[in-house]
Amino acid sequence: MTPDTKVRVASISKVVVAMCAMSMADEGLIDLDAPLSDYWGSGVRNSYSEVQPSVRTLMTHTSSLRNLEITRGLSHLRGLLQRPSTWRSMEPGNGGYWYYSNFGLCVLGTTLELACGGLLENYLQEHFLQPLGASASFYSETLEVGQLAALYTTGGVGRSVAEQMAQTTPTQIGQTASYFPGGFTASARDMAKLAAVLANDGVYKEPVYRSIELESTQDTHGIVGVILQLMENRYTETRLLSAESVEALEQPYFTVDPITSSPFQQCLILRRQEDILGQNVLYYHTGSAYGVFALMTYNPETRNGVVVLTTGAPRNTDDRGLYALCADLSEKLYEKMDGDPV
C-alpha cells in the first residue's frame, strides 16, 4: 500500500456525508433543524414525541431511530420511517439517549439526496472531490481497479478487489443509502485533503510551485529541463465550506461515556477529545470494517491533521477508544509535524 492506494475507509465515510450536509446548509438546500417530514413526507414522524427528528439529530446520533439493519431503496426506507416500531419513545436530540446508528446514516444521506434532488455522490464530486483533485467515491466500482486495496482481516481476505468492483452503481435517490455509513473509498492522501478543509475552517490550501526552465547547454546535448520549486508560504486557496459551517460541525453537544474507554464529546458526526495523542485537542472519527482500521484526526489549533488507513492488523483499542495501531502512528506523525500547518 502507498498513500495513493484506495481503501474503503469504513465509518470515516460519515464525516464525508456530514461535510455534504453542511455544504447544502450553506447553499440553503437543507435546514438542519427542519423535521425529516419536510423532505420525506408527512407520514415520516416519531409518534411518541412532540419534538421531531431532524438532520441535526441524525448527525448527533440522537434521532430516536431504533437500531435497524443497514438498508437502501427510497420506498423501502420511507416505509420503515412511517412505522411507529422504527422509533424509540424519546425526545430527539436528548444526549442521554445517544445511540451510534449506522441506519441513521442511511437516512441522513438519503435525506440529503431528497433535499438536493439528486445523488449525493454527484453532489460530493462536484462540490468537494473535483475541486480538490481527489479521485474517490462511494462507488468503488467506478475507480481504477489497480488502485484499490484488497481488505484483509487477521484470518484472510475480508473483501477482495473483485468483490469491490462487483458493486452496482446506483442511479436513483435512495439506492446509495447502504453505502453512506461506511462505503466511501479513498486514498489516505485524498482523505487528508478533506480533513485539511476542516482543519483550515473550510478552506483548502494547495501549495504553489514555480517552474524553472533549465537552458540547453553543450553539456546537456540540447535537452531542456524544467524543475518545479515549492514557493514558501504561497498557496492557492479554495473555500469549500463556510467557516460558520465548520464551527457548527465542531460544536460539542454532550459527552458520551462508552464505559470501556475515555469519554468523548459528540459534535455533528465528529468527536472531540482533549489531551490526546500529544495534542491539546483533536476532532476525529474512527472506522472499522472488513479488516480495515482507520483514524482521521485534526487539531484545530495547529491545523495539523493525520489520516491512517490500515488493513490486516489485529483489532486492538487503546484507553481513548482509538484503534491502537492507528493511534500510535498518528501520535508519531504529530510529533514529526511539530506545528507545521496542514
Where are these regions (language model features)?
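N-terminal leader/targeting segments and the immediately adjacent pre-domain N-terminus
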Residues: 1-7, 23-31, 60, 113-114, ...
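Short, surface-exposed loop or secondary-structure junction motifs
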Residues: 47-286
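A short acidic/glycine-rich loop-to-helix N-cap element
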Residues: 312-325
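Short, flexible turn/loop "capping" segments at secondary-structure junctions
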Residues: 1, 170-175, 299-302
